[in-house]
Regions:
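Residue-level signal for short amphipathic helical patches enriched in basic/charged
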Residues: 14-17, 70
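Extracytoplasmic/periplasmic, Sec-exported soluble proteins
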Residues: 2-6, 51, 80
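Alpha-helix capping/termination and helix-coil
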Residues: 17-18, 46
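Flexible linker/context regions in extracytoplasmic redox proteins
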Residues: 2-5, 21, 58, 72
Length: 96
């Protein structure tokens, strides 16, 4: 569970920010990207980007500014606010 996060709103925001252009994401129409990793079963993952422990606050911070957490990552900052990121994280954690 993500404090301050609404999974339904998060799914909508993931669509609005076009995360599916790079990621395949279950339950998001047209989210079939192949540039980034699939986000299927994201809620079962132990790590974000292979090295950052996957817990809700870290995931929200990652969504806001990936390069600040893992310099050299190919995932760009997309202009997502912290409240928006909490909603998006709430959705991603539901993917089992």
């Amino acid at each position: 569970m993500v404090a301050g996060g609404d999974a339904k709103l998060g799914a909508k925001l993931i669509g609005q920010f076009q995360c599916g252009a790079c990621h395949a994401i279950p339950d998001i129409p047209a989210a079939q990207g192949r540039t980034g990793p699939t986000l299927a079963a994201y809620g079962r993952r132990s790590y974000i980007a292979g090295s950052i422990p996957n817990y809700p606050d870290a995931l929200a911070r990652w969504i806001v500014n990936p390069p600040a957490m893992k310099p050299g990552t190919t995932m760009p900052a997309m202009g997502v606010s912290e409240p928006e990121a909490r909603h998006m994280a709430a959705f991603l954690i539901t993917l089992r």
